[in-house]
Amino acid sequence: MSEAGYRMYEKSVGSGKRFAFSCDTAELKHYLSRRKASLEKVRENFEPLWKEIRLYFEPNFGKALLGNSDRDQSASTRDDEKILNSEPRQCVHRYSAGMQSGITNKAQPWCSIVPKLIDEEESADPELNKWCNNATTEILSALERANFYRVSQNVYPHAALFGTSAILILRGEEPGDIHFHLIDEGDYWISCDRYGQVNTLMRRVSMTLDQAREEFFWENLPESWRNQIKEGKLEERVEVMNLICPNDGSEKFKDIDKSRAYASIYWLDKQGGAENNGILDISSFSYKPFAVLRQMDSGAVYGKGLGEMSLPDCKELQKLEEYLLRMIANEAEPAMIAPSSMKGQPINMFPGGVTFYDGMMQSGAAPVGRLFQTQEGIDKVDIKIRDIASRIGSIWYNDLFAMMLQVNTANRNQKTATEVAELSAEKVTLLGPVLTQMDEFLTSVIDGVFRILIEDGAIGEPPEVLMSGDADISVEYTSTIHAEMRAALKMRAINMLIEMTTMLAPAKPGALDKIDEDHIIDTVCKVYPGAAAFVKKTSEVMKIREARSREQQQAIANQQLAEMMKNAGANAKALSETHIGNGNALEAVMGGAA
């Protein structure tokens, strides 16, 4: 049964319009309150840092940390007073654009379902290959139909700023439809299992009364909400809590079938009265309905991000920017010094203005002048600001994305192929730890989408070899950055081998005998599939080599024949010049032969 169908089944088993919960709602509400307090206690240690990060980098993120339940009001309020230099803010969005285009680029396939644990020298079962290709196509199509790419471009900056980012993976109304929802920082709490994997997510949901009416049973809504809905106040916002956790099959989850993997409970934290003790809805999922990205694993529940790493530099940058603006203002409208005798007299500082002064001019100096000079200080502060901005950009990998662009365009004409490969490899490998964390997040996304499509029948039945356990499947990431990293590692080894062999060859010519040039070319074609179009087939190469071998053998034979003819002529001449009796040696030989 599909997720939507299962949810409708769960809701239909009640009497009338109210869901007849089988569990003890009072006990469940007590459990939820304790769970909420426990999760909040863990996260409150991180909140001061997150609040500071958002103010210095991107105040539009983490609005939920302000505690304002009216999200429309908080979204319309500016709180970017601490940002005088927008470079850190731009770094965040450049990073987001770089990761989106390099990892989850909608314009090209960035993942594929592949057979697992099959030897590279052997080919997978043709039926399994066909099924994997179909699964890949369906997954990428579902992601494109959904709002995944709009959500993912915000996942990257959230995780980079705060260290952690979370999304929901929800089934749509129609089979095969999927909806993704980004949860803003401050609106969710998480917990991990013993393996360090996030398995519990609690979130605070701000929704309009119209949305609440669509989401929950009418009779389960508080009476005050129902009255407001009847009055047409559909845009009034309310706040509910939602806990998504593994279904342990206990009494508190009595309303959920034990075969379901995850339980989801909506409840009112501060109200609810006698109506089911504030429990609004109990539902379930057959898959993990959320994915969490932790930028850097710090050993804690929540990750560490680039925002924390670059926060000291960002603070210093804003402070220096304030100094610079003040100095520029002093340069434009400088503090002045004048003799006390001019106190109370007007000074005309406009262009062409005249100020009358009755005192004596000393040493040719003007009676009114600047109190101090600021130009030299402006230059020094400006240089320091650029230096700090460059450091922040490096932390946010902006120089890496710029370098990758330059390596592939203008600078390519100024560098050798080896230099380009080495430079590209050096830069891309810096993203290795980041990609490891990204893969964990993306695997959760692909797994959720895959399970939904399987249950909805969008992906056909798995082949027998997969059902029997003789083979398995896995996700392979083929994005630009993933491919570049794999290529960089392989090409570095190939280039090192060729370089070392070339160095040894002059002293030890036999070293070249160890090199299999055909295998090197084939490996490079696997690393860069586009290059295969310019490489001849093995059969054609064999014909060319055979023809070349015949030509070389013929040339050697002709040379040997020429040498023999040359030697024969020289010998004949020598014999003819050797006198024997009345003749010469050549005549004697020819006569003897006769």
Q: How should these model regions be labeled?
A:
Residues Q153-F162, N227-V238, S250-R260, L311, ...:
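Short, surface-exposed loop and linker segments with low hydrophobicity and enrichment for Pro/Ser/Thr
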Residues D125-W131, N199, Q295-G299, G353-T355, ...:
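A broad, low-specificity signal for short, low-complexity segments enriched in glycine/proline
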